[in-house]
UniProtKB/Swiss-Prot annotation:
Forms oligomeric structures. SUPFAM superfamilies: HSP20-like chaperones. One of its GO terms (biological process) is response to salt stress. Gene3D superfamilies: 2.60.40.790. GO terms for cellular component: cytoplasm. Coiled coil: none annotated. Pfam families: HSP20 (PF00011). It comes from Glycine max (Soybean). Residues 47-161 form the sHSP domain. This is 18.5 kDa class I heat shock protein. The keyword Acetylation does not apply. GO terms for molecular function: unfolded protein binding. The gene is HSP18.5-C. Belongs to the small heat shock protein (HSP20) family.
């Protein structure tokens, strides 16, 4: 048990942990149901707070669009990469809560659990049938090859006169 109680509830925020940043809910402690509360919008609840904070870089090279997501502590089996309607890349995953044993005494809980999901609309030149994904050291890399840009055939016209 911590010597200093946490009066604010929940886990402490850590800017380096994408699963620890909580979304503030101004209606959370109201004693009555509210249509704007997280109960009405579960996708914005504390359990899904990592949705907001998962960091993703997107760069475009001459050959491909490359997405890199920081997802430390997850195995590749806990991450999904999907293409929806041939135009939306979706990266999602979930870190589950560690099983509790009744004989265990927890002194500190800083590693958090939760879900994340990020969606990106792909440009027209994306070859969605050739997408590849890999994961190494907590970084997911998704590579979406691009269609080759056809250079227009230019024909010079001689000007008479």
């Amino acid at each position: 048990m911590s010597l200093i109680p946490n009066f604010f509830g929940g886990r402490r925020n850590n800017v380096f942990d994408p699963f620890s940043l909580d979304v503030w809910d101004p209606f959370k402690d109201f004693p009555f149901p509210n249509t704007l509360s997280s109960a009405s919008f579960p996708e914005f609840s504390r359990e899904n707070s990592a949705f907001v904070s998962t960091r993703v870089d997107w760069k475009e090279t001459p050959e491909a669009h490359v997405f890199k997501a920081d997802i430390p502590g997850l195995k590749k089996e806990e991450v999904k990469v999907q293409i929806e309607d041939d135009k939306v890349l979706q990266i999602s995953g979930e870190r589950n809560v560690e099983k509790e044993d009744k004989n265990d005494t927890w002194h500190r809980v800083e590693r958090s659990s939760g879900k994340f999901m990020r969606r990106f609309r792909l440009p027209e030149n994306a070859k969605v049938e050739q997408v590849k994904a890999s994961m190494e050291n907590g970084v997911l890399t998704v590579t979406v090859p691009k269609e080759e840009v056809k250079k227009p055939d230019v024909k010079a016209i001689e000007i008479s006169g």
